[in-house]
Amino acid sequence: MKTAIVTDGKYRSSIAAVRALHRAGYQVIVTQTRADVHAVPAVAASRCCAAFRWIDGAAADDSYADRLAALLETYDRPVLFCVGAVTLNTVAAQRERFARVADFLIAPRPVLDALNDKETVHARAQSLGIPVPRQYDGVPPERYPVVIKPHCGEKFGLKAADRYAVADTPEAYAQILARMQRYDPAPIVQDRITGPGIGVSLLLGRDGCLICALCHRRIREYPVTGGPSTCCESFYDAALIDRAYRLLHSFGFTGMAMVEFKGDCLLEVNPRVWGSFPMTEAAQSPFTADYARAAGGMVCPHGRLHPPGRLCSLPHGTALSDAKTYGAGRRFRPAPCVYGI
């Protein structure tokens, strides 16, 4: 039986990955760095997890790459599925080394860095004719509201709620700009686009071919002013899939990514496992299994799409979102809970 190693078991997305890989016939091993958690992650108790392995220290340690590589060497060329961004970047920075002991689909570090830079993505999208929000470079906005954000909020360790802020007036703009300049001397300032958030999740093979695609529309998010999905619904949009693919392909990307839109406008790219990744499991998508098969050199059908209308609700986040919505006096409609953690 082929082995798959799922890293960073503390994240909720690891549960979806473990279930999908187990169902695809893999022996699934979950890892977690001791210093990054206070207790054994819940995924370790899953019947789909064949074994749980601690890694000493933290994922941010300089020695993490050595410890992860040593663990991988104890298995016969496993598939490596990186859930955490730090682990992904660690492997991306030493792809040749890790490729000697494991199979994976991970883009080179410079490609990941470029896709994490919102201004680089904005400029590339414009060159490809993909709609983007109007951006104000070094000049005060002509109209409000505007969104102010650093080039890469994760780089500064910011939580989702702190990675951007909305200014409705010139006074608020000046205050927020000064705050964001603590992280980025030249924050990005764009028109705020209204409407539901849309995610286009793609899996690209080593040759850049599109293997799998899944679209989702946000129903709930937390924070309610803008944050990760807590409840979403799958749907199909060929035009958005094409735009997302052309953008990723132009960077020479390989692996998994979620391209975020509002309406027709492209906002940003998450070139890694994203917050609403459990939707791939709720939608019964072969996303994770196709990743493992393609990483191991198997030929997968190209351009696999999935039926619309599947719901994914993450109970804890949905409860927080509903409570905030109700407390703010907005119309309250409880979201369904259809995906259990």
Task: Please state what every model-predicted region is.
Residues A289-I341:
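Peripheral (often C-terminal) accessory segments that flank ATP-dependent C-N-forming ligase machineries
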Residues I188-V189, T254-E260, P301-L305:
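Flexible, glycine/charged-enriched surface loops at secondary-structure junctions
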Residues L248-E281:
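Conserved metal-phosphate-binding beta-hairpin within the catalytic cores
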Residues R220-P223, P228-T230, N270-A283:
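Glycine-rich phosphate/pyrophosphate-binding beta-alpha loops
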Residues D168-G226, C232-Y245, H249, G263-L266:
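Phosphate-binding site of ATP-dependent enzymes
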Residues M1-L105:
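ATP-binding N-terminal substructure of ATP-dependent carboxylate-amine bond-forming enzymes
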Residues L112-P187, T194, R206-C209, A238-A239:
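Active-site nucleotide/adenylate-binding loops and adjacent lid/helix of ATP-dependent enzymes
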